[in-house]
From Swiss-Prot:
Cellular compartments annotated: Membrane
Taxonomic source organism: Homo sapiens (Human)
Membrane topology (UniProt): Single-pass membrane protein
Transmembrane portions of the chain: 16-36
Protein name per Swiss-Prot or TrEMBL: Cortexin domain containing 2
């Protein structure tokens, strides 16, 4: 009985680690796409951020 509870605890920890890594990869992919948009068209990206302060 105690062995099964110990192994399930290890599986929960492994699940949290895998979920954390997956979330990190998703965040990395989102940042890559945002940076690619900025590199592709920097003037449009900068004009949308500075537009409210100019008006």
């Amino acid at each position: 009985m105690e062995d099964s509870s110990l192994s399930s605890g290890v599986d929960v920890d492994k699940g949290f680690a895998i979920a954390f890594v997956v979330l990190l990869f998703l965040f990395l992919i989102v940042m890559i796409f945002r940076c690619a948009k900025l590199v592709k068209n920097p003037y449009k990206a900068s004009s949308t951020t500075t537009e409210p302060s100019l008006s």
